[in-house]
Amino acid sequence: TGKENGPKFNPFFIPKMISDIAAGQISIMYGFHGPNYATCSACATSTNAIADAFNLIRLGKANVIVSGGSEAAIAACGVGGFNAMHALSTRNDSPETASRPFSASRDGFIMGEGGGCLVLEELEHAKARDAKIYAEVAGVGMSADAHHLTASHPEGLGAKLVMLNALEDAEMKPEEVDYINVHGTSTPVGDISEAKAIKEVFGQHAYELNISSTKSMTGHLLGAAGAVESIASILAIKNGIVPPTINHEEGDNDENIDYGLNFTFNKAQKREVNVALSNTFGFGGHNACVIFKKYAE
């Protein structure tokens, strides 16, 4: 039998392996009895989780949902697997400058670890308990590239569609958006395709936007990226400060990227941000987008 002749397993082997246990632990710890599950869409995961929470609340299935994501894949199998795919930067002599989205010398992403959670709440419920409201979720979008297992569509078709879907859901015009926290992983193909998609969706207004990739500072947080970058977008609204895309060097320009776009290179910029849009894209062609807007009392 397996008990007599097979390998010995820790009784926590299965619970520690399945991703839904993270959501389960939060439910157990705080006594939450509402919808409880985990989403999985690679690097779009926690944005999809936020979208799910938003949809459940507006469907009347819950008043409050804790939603987010975490990832800790800096281990031999995680780094080795991404390295075998040639997805990681090889700038090993200067790792702190290796994540350089939208620069010509970018050569792959840097892995990070982290997590983030947001408390999403039905507006009247939040007001009734005098909650501190940082921003409102205005709309969400989802799409699929239907192109390749790991590479984004070279023309950014999925990225374009997901932003249009989110704008439609929010009942907003492109001209209302002030800041885009881009997926921007510092990969040769992905950054070009996302920049193309932004120009197609926003037209001339693309040149009035602030655009930045906080992955230049955090590394790629994989399944946690959407949650952490949503928080960065919300704080840009709250504080009127757009975080930068660091590590860009003078003249390090890619001929396939339009530098008339304001990528907020190297230094945070003050501006009023009433609406912020956050993109996350994942292996498998998963695209997710969430739009936040300033809360007007």
Predicted regions and their residues:
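Beta-strand segments within the central parallel beta-sheet cores of soluble alpha/beta enzyme folds
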Residues: 36-41, 62-70, 132-140, 175-182, ...
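Glycine-rich phosphate/pyrophosphate-binding beta-alpha loops
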Residues: 42, 185-187, 217-223, 280-287
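Short glycine/threonine-rich loop-to-helix capping motif typified by GTGT followed
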Residues: 147-159, 185-202, 221-228, 261-262
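Conserved catalytic cysteine-centered active-site region
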Residues: 1-52, 61, 85-110, 196-227
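Conserved beta-strand-centric core segments of catalytic alpha/beta enzyme folds
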Residues: 25-29, 45-125, 225-297
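Residue-level signal for alpha-helix termini/capping positions
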Residues: 31, 58-59, 127-128, 168-171, ...
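Short, well-ordered amphipathic alpha-helical segments that serve as non-catalytic structural scaffolds
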Residues: 22, 49, 121-122, 155-171, ...
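Condensing-enzyme catalytic core mediating Claisen C-C bond formation in acyl metabolism
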Residues: 93-170, 179, 297
